[in-house]
Regions:
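N-terminal charged helix/coil linker that caps or initiates catalytic domains
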Residues: 1-26
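Glycine-rich, flexible N-terminal cofactor/catalytic loop recognition
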Residues: 27, 44-47
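Conserved N-terminal Rossmann-fold NAD(P)-binding element of oxidoreductases
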Residues: 27-29, 52
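Hydrophobic/small residue at the entry helix of a nucleotide-binding pocket
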Residues: 33-34
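Aromatic pocket-lining residues of Rossmann-like dinucleotide-binding sites
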Residues: 41
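Glycine-rich phosphate-binding loop and adjoining beta1-alpha1-beta2 segment
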Residues: 46, 51-89
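A structured beta-alpha segment of the ubiquitous adenosine-cofactor-binding alpha/beta core
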Residues: 74-114
Length: 115
């Protein structure tokens, strides 16, 4: 029976897919590069993704950010990205942080929990 990751498993193998499913990744900034990154991680079968950004989608993002569309302008990027990830991979646990990573917010993140 085919599932959403059967083609990926053909390339990586079952053991690697199990490792991806059990992994947790943090992506800081989900605009340009980060938006494409979280989508690729979700499509690869990563089991948990923490996304960190405090910016909102604006009109000038549409030409270069995968999460930016006419419908997403004005919304927080992490909220848009979370919804997109959950559509792609409903089994992925997504935690959205509406904050920027700064010295004063660094203690919010336990880096030992990420792979």
């Amino acid at each position: 029976m085919l599932d959403r990751f059967s083609r990926t498993q053909l390339v990586f193998g079952k053991e690697a897919m199990d490792r991806l499913k059990g992994s947790r990744v943090a992506v800081f900034g989900v605009g340009g590069v980060g938006g494409y990154t979280v989508e690729a991680l979700a499509r690869s079968g990563v089991g948990a993704i923490d996304i960190i950004d405090n910016d909102k989608v604006c009109l000038t993002n549409i030409n270069r950010q995968i999460i930016a569309t006419g419908k997403t302008v004005g919304k927080y990027k992490v909220d848009v990205a979370k919804e997109r990830i959950e559509e792609i991979n409903p089994d992925c646990k997504v935690t959205a942080f509406r904050t920027f990573y700064m010295p004063e917010t660094a203690d919010q993140f336990d880096f030992t929990q990420y792979d």
